[in-house]
Each structure stands twice: as structure tokens, then as C-alpha cells.
Amino acid sequence: MNYKIALIRGDGIGPEVVGEAVKVMEAIGEKFGHTFTYTDVLMGGCAIDAVGKSYPDGTAEACKACDAVLLGAVGGPKWGHASAPEKRPETALLSIRRDLGLYANLRPAVLRPAMADACPLKKETAEKGIDLMMVRELTGGIYFGKRDRYQTED
């Protein structure tokens, strides 16, 4: 089976992480008979540098045309002081989450019993190991909202 994957390499460590993830996917494909077609998509600081805005036209459409999106990392200190929303990498994250209808990030936390000594939890808890999945909701509240400033006469 062939899968179309949108690659958003992004900024900072993102290109390296995505590059290594592609190697893993290729190994999985060889073992299980899958093939992958990759489409590179610009988003974040690298998009600001290339086309002047963090969420270029066509980004959502390119991602929607694929079976999955592999996102590296977006943002960094180079772009952290821009005042215009289209020049801030995190606005691209909010936009793509909205446009793709994404609800949550899944953040696994696993502690193997062999690593108990490196954990700040009580020894009797850490020795049992931990296998926890955090679900971080993305669609509402202050986390998702746009930044605005209001000035009053008072």
C-alpha cells in the first residue's frame, strides 16, 4: 500500500527529526510492504524566510491531499519578536490545527523500571514503571486564541 505523507520539516531540530523519521518509515515500508510518497510543505520560520509568512497559501490544501502529516518543530528565537501575526511561527500551528480539524496532541510518557533511579518519583512508584498518555486539547481556551490588545480610556 502507498501512503502520501506531507513533511513539514520546520525549524530548529525539526528538519533533523523529520529526516530520521523518514528513515524509520522507509525501514517499516521495506519490512511490511508499504511505500511512501513525500510532499515537502513549508510552514513556520523557514516559510517566513522563504516566502514572507509562516503559513503560506496552499499549506492546508497540500496537507489535506495527503494521508498524514509529519511535523518537525516550528519556531525559534530568530522569529520570536515579530509583531505581525503572519511573521510569527506559532500562528501557523494554530492555523493548521484549525484547517485540518485537529482536536488534540497525544503526549506519551513512559518510564521503564530500569530507569527508576533517574526519576524524581518515589522509588516504589518508579520501579513499577509508568505508561501514561496525556491528551492535550487544542481547540479552545486561551491556548488557541488569537493575541489581541485593547486600550480603554479609563
Question: Which role does the model predict for each range below?
Answer:
Residues 41:
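The conserved SAM/SAH-binding core of class I Rossmann-like methyltransferase domains
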Residues 1-12, 30, 37, 45-154:
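Anion-binding alpha/beta catalytic cores of soluble intermediary-metabolism enzymes, centered on
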Residues 13-18:
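Short N-terminal binding/cap micro-motifs at the start of the first secondary-structure element
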Residues 19-32:
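Short catalytic helix/loop segments, enriched in acidic residues and glycine
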